[in-house]
Amino acid sequence: METSNFYNEILTEHNIRPYHKHDMPDATFSLNGVNPSCGDDITLKLKVVDDVIEDASFIGDGCAISQASADIMADMVIGRSKEEALRLAEMFIRMIKGSVTNEEIDELEEAGALKDISHMPARVKCAVLGWHTLQEIFEKNEDANT
Amino acid sequence: METSNFYNEILTEHNIRPYHKHDMPDATFSLNGVNPSCGDDITLKLKVVDDVIEDASFIGDGCAISQASADIMADMVIGRSKEEALRLAEMFIRMIKGSVTNEEIDELEEAGALKDISHMPARVKCAVLGWHTLQEIFEKNEDANT
Amino acid sequence: MSINVNISHREDFPLLRDSNIVYLDNAATSQKPDCVIEAVEEFYHKHNANPLRGFYELAMLATEQLENSRTTVKEFINAKFEEEVIFTKGTTESINLIANSYGMNFLGEGDEILISIMEHHCNILPWQFVASKTGAVLKYLECDMDGLISDTAIEEAITDKTKIVAITQLSNVLGRENPIARITKTAHEHGAIVVMDAAQSVVHVKIDVQALDVDFMAFSGHKIMSPMGIGILYGKKELLNKMPPFLRGGEMIESVTRTDAVFAQLPYKFEAGTDNASGAVGLMAAINYINSIGMEYMHERTLMLTKMCFDAICKIPHIHIIGAKDSNNHNGIISFTIDNVHPHDVSQILSESNVCVRAGHHCAQPLCDFLGFKSCTRASFMFYNTQEDIDTFIKSLSGIRKMMGYGD
Amino acid sequence: MSINVNISHREDFPLLRDSNIVYLDNAATSQKPDCVIEAVEEFYHKHNANPLRGFYELAMLATEQLENSRTTVKEFINAKFEEEVIFTKGTTESINLIANSYGMNFLGEGDEILISIMEHHCNILPWQFVASKTGAVLKYLECDMDGLISDTAIEEAITDKTKIVAITQLSNVLGRENPIARITKTAHEHGAIVVMDAAQSVVHVKIDVQALDVDFMAFSGHKIMSPMGIGILYGKKELLNKMPPFLRGGEMIESVTRTDAVFAQLPYKFEAGTDNASGAVGLMAAINYINSIGMEYMHERTLMLTKMCFDAICKIPHIHIIGAKDSNNHNGIISFTIDNVHPHDVSQILSESNVCVRAGHHCAQPLCDFLGFKSCTRASFMFYNTQEDIDTFIKSLSGIRKMMGYGD
Ligand SMILES: Cc1ncc(COP(=O)(O)O)c(C=O)c1O
Ligand SMILES: Cc1ncc(COP(=O)(O)O)c(C=O)c1O
């Protein structure tokens, strides 16, 4: 586990200069996700039109991993359909559990920068917080939205 | 600790053929003493006239040590004054705790056969049950009797 | 399975290896093999940190050890989920947890708690307490003089009023295995839950909580060759989920304010305070050791030793074995009385020949009362005992009445 | 006392001796010296039996070891009587015992429980529970931003309604020693009892329960170099005598019938189940080790290390130490925040240099809220830490903001 490699530029950049950390007045979904034991706390906001994520943002605070991971996620899901976003979420969570192929890591783009979390059980929750919240938004609203 | 020496003739004799294990209809004092954790259970009976123990007996059951010790005690205190009996009780209990002189052990006569109990913490309660009950009888009745 | 009585496992146990002790008090606590003692040592040499708390490597190693142990226990008892396995300090704490968290909160006036007459005090007193506080009624399920709990007794004792049946899988006095699956079935038909005390059985019977369908199960590590101070509570997830915590403190919370707290998920909700990780590691090593020797083999060997001893005792006059007439129903436990010799004297005389047995009421006074004696002597075996152990024991036992001054 | 910083005690601790770990999470748990690990091993090699139960020699040895440990603890904390020393599995169990046995039975509607704002969750949640069940009111005694509890605060908070004051002798976040004797005096004037959490203090402050006049006191062995799974509850005899038992089972009874039980004398009334004798033996070895090193020397050394580290941190920009400005008020505990870097990231980055520190709310969320942060990083020292440890820590700490992408 090489931490200095781990806190790489992708991660630190998304942490200190997040693109998508802001409010979204016209969001169609908003959900709070927390890791109570860590104190990580984000509110994910999505603007979904016809099952396509037109915009994504988050507010909140927490460790660099939770914040950067949420920011990277927002970046990735904007413009994607609900199904594609959920497929990425599933893939990301699998990566964190240590069972993805190299092709899949490539597909995860910048989120692949978090793959070493699979060796850091204590940080798993931080990395997946954003993605879990995304999944929850769509699960909770499945009925309403179909 | 040589147990075979310990269960000597004095002890086994007093255990299986106790002289004083019987009821006493004209007892002036009767008190039940128990070691709940061991199950030792005796009722000590004394006939005290003018502060002199005219007769002593016990009923009940328990291990050889508790029974033999009670029987030996009864033997020793018959004919003695309350004060002398209490002095012997104090001496006996000290012997069990391992702090008596050889002269004192001699004075304890047959009760001296129990001196090795001082090396058997688990059996101390058994050996002193009779003597404790004797002390209790006189303590409880101090006011009534003076 | 064919057991060679001449093969000895004594060598694995330093206390036995380095002494001439004839240890026949295995039902009180077991001896520990080198591998268990060394596992604890290794934990302190290499992995010691407060588990579940840190982000540094050592703390993660400690956490991993603790959770590996949980997984090992889960497989050992065939639980469905890891989070159904809760670390406690022993059977006594586990049962008190159930009584305080489940009993106190889900019982009321007129409900019935059924326990067997052969329970250990730790499966009696917590229920007396619950009964006194909730107004529930404590009832007893009785056995016959052979220690058998009959189907009829079960059918009669369990009614729609019964809410909890708490019973040992194996009596620490009688050694007989109780018909748990039978009891669970009847209890569930009447809507009652079953708490199984596995303190004695865990080392003799392969436990399968799913097959037995028990709702709660408890055992202590120290009786299965693991260190002292660690034990297990198993509970079905849906029950544990609806129960409030028992001990309260660190690790079992999600968040705390001045006035309130949100509790953590299972299993942590029930593991307040620093977990005994070294104990858990020792327990894991003990289970691995058991698996390497083979549970079935261990049990067969114990039964063989039990039979040898049982048959020999039967030949000594004035000795009366308590419970079943068939040694196969004794599972390593032989309790007995000797005419006119008190068990404490028996135990002390045996101790002279380095034979360690237990004497007394064995924390089962209601059973002693029921069977009509105050106390008894108990010899209990594990697979690491030897034929020599039994020979020494029998020889010393045979001379006791004479030593106590009796003619025969 | 003059302390030579170059003398190292690291050699006594196998985990430190055989690695390059910089262990600064001592407030979570301590490392164990060889003598403690070996004492546990020796117990299993030579004395292992179920204590308090047997009449054979091995059982008496086990009992003797357990009781010797009790005597050692009695002297260590200067209790008046052996039977005031009760073995538990740790601070958390000890405090839960007090809350459940004393709190639940001697408090009622309108009574007040006073705890400090800096309590560990295990000295908060049990009282929240007691308050919710008995109708008592839970109040908080506050400190200032330096962690000081003033005389005025004490005088105002303790009233005739106060029945229990539960307070830590040393905060696990602030490291500051609280004025316990002062609190006890006021509490007693108002007829309240005092429960002291000594989990953190026991390794830094020479505890004298009689001089402090506390009514109850609790600590865990694992924080003072003894094995996990053992802890102490001290209570004044007259209070313990009038309290009902907490855990119920074997060993804590005199006699049991189907419907009732007579409880044993102190200390056994509160020690249901098989005692963790090997844990007690380890605790005894740890106390003997402490006595051989010298409590005062240990503390002086810790203060010196604390000061070195404190002064160095003060020179790093963007780092804020929590609590007192004087390092002598930190007793081996330095908690801090770094601007814009989350403590979990701090801890993980330090871990890269083998530095073990803890990050989070440290089981003291109400204190964090009160002081205005969600979490912080904590470095905590024991006498076996070295100047090198601190150098490595400071070096790594200095580079964190840069590593996280900040310009300075
Ligand atoms: C002040 C304080 N109290 C109580 C505890 C709890 O101790 P344990 O987890 O050993 O029960 C701790 C340590 O975690 C502590 O620092
Ligand atoms: C059947 C049974 N249940 C419970 C216990 C209690 O176990 P522990 O003392 O380890 O809590 C014992 C052993 O003493 C036992 O034999």
Regions found by a protein language model. Name each.
Chain A
Residues 1-25, 82-146:
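C-terminal binding/interaction regions
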Residues 38, 65, 119-123:
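Secondary-structure capping and boundary motifs in well-ordered enzyme cores
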